[in-house]
Design a protein with these regions (language model features):
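N-terminal intrinsically disordered, acidic low-complexity segments at the extreme N-terminus
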Residues: 1-6
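C-terminal cap/substrate-recognition subdomain and adjoining C-terminal extension
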Residues: 7, 12-16, 51-72, 99, ...
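N-terminal Sec-pathway targeting helices
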Residues: 13-29
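Non-catalytic pre-domain segments flanking phosphatase-related domains
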Residues: 21-22, 35-111, 119, 123-126, ...
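A metal-dependent, Asp-based hydrolase signature
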Residues: 56-57, 120-206, 211
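Electropositive phosphate-/nucleotide-binding environments in soluble metabolic enzymes
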Residues: 80, 179, 295
Length: 386
């Protein structure tokens, strides 16, 4: 009997120990799960805060930020679809879940008609060509240059630039400056753009930047974007116009190019010539090197940037190639925006072209930007179209 009691007590204690062990196991598992959850939560929170503090400089488009030193991002923009889509895009790529490293944040802008005036009454480099031929008393133009300048004048009057004129201006442009070194050429451009715009009051040629687009560039820079210009115009001319007006380094400006040679180089190839620091300077050679139109804009991006842009901004058919290229980014989603010059009250516009661009945007998935509907100003409130 004593043996049975002993065994019974032993079995009871054994079962009790098993119950206690099972209960403790459950408690340990629950505590461990809670600890793991807390650790993961804190880790993810710290990761998000790290992005926010150290990398993500996303700025609310409608709120004044101290980062801007009382500058309001996109203050010349109305509430519009383009602004909303850009804001949402920036918020998305600076979010921890869809984060794009700042070294991959690249935006490419066309120049004439996208951030700078192109219709008063024609592209700046065409006006420069015309001025050099007909208004520069120190220069003796060739008969061919006179003929091309006359075509430029005709284009100014009708508001259309033919493919033939583009070809003729592009191929003969360097001949205008054959006696200029690069410093003389840049000074000539600066003197030219320091004069008033013909069709506007209170606006110099060199100040004819679209204020909303300059705000947009600054906004992107605050969000760690690298800004590039890709223009069909001659590269040094674009660099010179931008210098002092928009904070974009010369190395980030892509354009059409002409051969540049040393003053005493003659017909000797560059790889066979030795530069003379005492007598040489550099100037255009009378030969065409590379245009930066259409697909060549993509090639220029590949050659000089070496990465796929996230954003492209253009205004014309010549920008369609790089617009489609940015939307074909395999690593990150890309957006293409097109400026539609549809405000004849504040700017000189071709309404038919603007409406066609809006249709092209619908067909291709580009985002239209309307000067008339999306911008509160173009050049500033004090600038008035004549």
């Amino acid at each position: 009997m004593d043996t049975q009691k002993l065994l019974s007590n032993y079995n009871f204690k054994r079962k009790d120990k098993l119950r206690l062990f099972f209960l403790l196991s459950i408690i340990i598992i629950l505590v461990a799960s809670i600890i793991c959850f807390i650790v993961l939560y804190v880790k993810e929170k710290n990761k998000t805060e790290s992005y926010s503090k150290n990398e993500n400089k996303y700025i609310n488009l409608d709120v004044e930020s101290s980062n801007y030193k009382s500058y309001i991002p996109l203050s010349s923009w109305k509430k519009c679809d383009a602004k909303t889509k850009l804001s949402d895009y920036i918020a998305n790529i600076t979010n921890a879940d869809n984060y794009v490293p700042k070294e991959d944040r690249i935006a490419v802008f066309d120049f004439d008609g996208t951030i700078f005036q192109e219709n008063d009454p024609i592209y700046n480099d065409y006006k420069l060509y015309y001025y050099r031929v007909y208004n520069d008393s120190k220069y003796t133009p060739t008969e061919e240059q006179k003929k091309i300048a006359a075509e430029i004048k005709k284009s100014m009057e009708i508001g259309e630039v033919s493919d033939e004129l583009i070809k003729n201006v592009t191929t003969t442009y360097p001949e205008l400056w054959k006696d200029f070194n690069m410093e003389d050429y840049e000074k000539y451009i600066k003197d030219f753009i320091d004069k008033p715009c013909e069709g506007f009051e209170n606006l110099k040629r060199g100040d004819a930047f679209y204020r909303p687009m300059i705000e947009l560039i600054e906004y992107l820079k605050k969000n760690d974007f690298q800004i590039y210009i890709s223009s069909g115009a001659e590269r040094v001319q674009v660099r010179t116009v931008i210098d002092g007006h928009v904070d974009i380094p010369p190395s980030n400006i892509i354009g059409s190019e002409y051969d540049i040679i040393a003053k005493n180089q003659g017909s000797v190839k560059g790889h066979e010539y030795t530069y003379d620091k005492n007598t040489d300077d550099f100037r255009f050679n009378n030969s065409f090197y590379r245009s930066n139109f259409r697909t060549n804009k993509i090639i220029g991006i590949i050659r000089e940037i070496g990465k796929h842009p996230l954003l492209v901004f253009g205004n014309a058919h010549g920008d369609s190639d790089m617009a489609n290229y940015v939307m074909n980014n395999k690593n990150y989603p890309g957006l293409a925006f097109m400026i539609c010059c549809d405000d004849n009250t504040r700017e000189k516009c071709n309404i038919q072209k603007a409406e066609q661009m809006k249709e092209d945007c619908k067909k291709n998935g580009w985002i239209p930007i309307s000067m008339k509907d999306d911008w509160t100003t173009i050049y500033g409130e004090n600038v008035i179209k004549k």
